[in-house]
Each structure stands twice: as C-alpha cells, then as structure tokens.
C-alpha cells in the first residue's frame, strides 16, 4: 500500500531549534554547529495508527530578513509545527505576536502543534544564570500549555533534539493532526494570497 503523503512546515524564531528538531527526527543525528536556515526540505517516513505516512518536512528561516520568502513554503501545508525555545521567553512571546498571525493568514484551518524546544536547558545552570541577568527564567510547562490554548493549537509538546527526548512524539502528534485535517475536506489547504 502506498504511503499517504503529508506536508509539515516548521516555523518559529531564528535559532529556536527548528532545524535540529527536523534533522534529529529525519536523520537521527544532532548538528553541533548552528547554521541559519534559508530553505531546506527533508522527507521522513513515519507510521502512526498502522498508517504509513511520508512526511515532507519543510524547514524555514525564522530571521526577519526572510519574512517575504517564508510564505513560499505555505501552500498545501497539512500541519504546522510552531516552535519556541524553552531557554528564550522572548521566542514564546513571538508566538502570538508574529507566528500565529502569519500562519493563520496563509494557512487558515491548518492544525498547529506548539512545540517547546531545548527542554534540556530548562534546568541548565548556565542558562538560568544568563536569563537571570535579564530578569527572566526558562519557560515553564504551564506557560507553554496556556499559550497553546490561547492560539487554539491542536496540541502542545516539549522536546530536546539534543537528548532526543520527546522528538518522536512531536512528529507522531503532527502526523495525527495532518491525517485528521484531511477528513474535514481539502478546503483547509494553505493559500498563497
């Protein structure tokens, strides 16, 4: 039986861990050096609920320089991974300020999974010290859940690409969301306006 094809687009602030999450999931290796993304595509096979799904993973650049290029990724998207970094409260703030309006404009009705990346840094001493200098602290799980409710996300998950904790669960939830969206009719596909 042929695999069902679904398209996943990942968005979020620059350096919040999007590319690492995709690479760890699709290639099972953690990239040690940071290279800002312009436009990358990966394909990964995943099985959920005894369905074979071929997931086209579309990486995007979070930097503002790419705000005009990013919408080229959106047409025909089945599910969005909207990411922030647990060690960056500012990246969580950009979820309702920047990412939700952009995604809901180009992809109305496409399910959104809110993902807290870099979970391993929540209890990291160096991270905590650096954030304290700015009178901040790592994002708490309940803050992520509250944000997911606020933006009407399909779900909220936390993961660490570095330790691989929670990575598979993110893509399983995303695949389930994409499969469910199909049942509501193909009218949900993203439009390029």
From Swiss-Prot:
Q: Which CDD domains match?
A: RhoA_like
UniProt modified residues of type Cysteine methyl ester: 190
Carbohydrate attachment residues: 34
InterPro entries xrefs? P-loop_NTPase, Small_GTP-bd, Small_GTPase, Small_GTPase_Rho
User: Where along the chain is GTP bound?
Assistant: 12-19, 30-37, 59-63, 117-120, 160-162
Q: Its biological function? A: Regulates a signal transduction pathway linking plasma membrane receptors to the assembly of focal adhesions and actin stress fibers.
Quote the protein name from its UniProt record.
Rho-related GTP-binding protein RhoA-A
Origin organism is Danio rerio
From the broadest rank down, the organism's phylogenetic lineage runs:
Eukaryota, Metazoa, Chordata, Craniata, Vertebrata
């Amino acid at each position: 039986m042929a695999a069902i094809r679904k398209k996943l687009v990942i968005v979020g602030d620059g350096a919040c861990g999007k590319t690492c999450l995709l690479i760890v999931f699709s290639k099972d290796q953690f990239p040690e050096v940071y290279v800002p993304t312009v436009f990358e595509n990966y394909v990964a096979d995943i099985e959920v609920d005894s369905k074979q799904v071929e997931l086209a993973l579309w990486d995007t650049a979070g930097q503002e320089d790419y705000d005009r290029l990013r919408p080229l990724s959106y047409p025909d998207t089945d599910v969005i991974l909207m990411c922030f970094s647990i060690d960056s409260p500012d990246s969580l703030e950009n979820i309702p300020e920047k990412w939700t309006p952009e995604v809901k404009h180009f992809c109305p009705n496409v399910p959104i999974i809110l993902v807290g990346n870099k979970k391993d840094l929540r209890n990291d001493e160096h991270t905590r010290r650096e954030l304290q200098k700015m009178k901040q602290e790592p994002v708490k799980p309940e803050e992520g859940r509250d944000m997911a409710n606020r933006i009407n996300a399909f779900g909220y998950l936390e993961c660490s690409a570095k330790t691989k904790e929670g990575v598979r669960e993110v893509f399983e939830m995303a695949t389930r969301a994409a499969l469910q969206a199909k049942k509501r009719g193909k009218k949900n596909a993203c439009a390029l306006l």
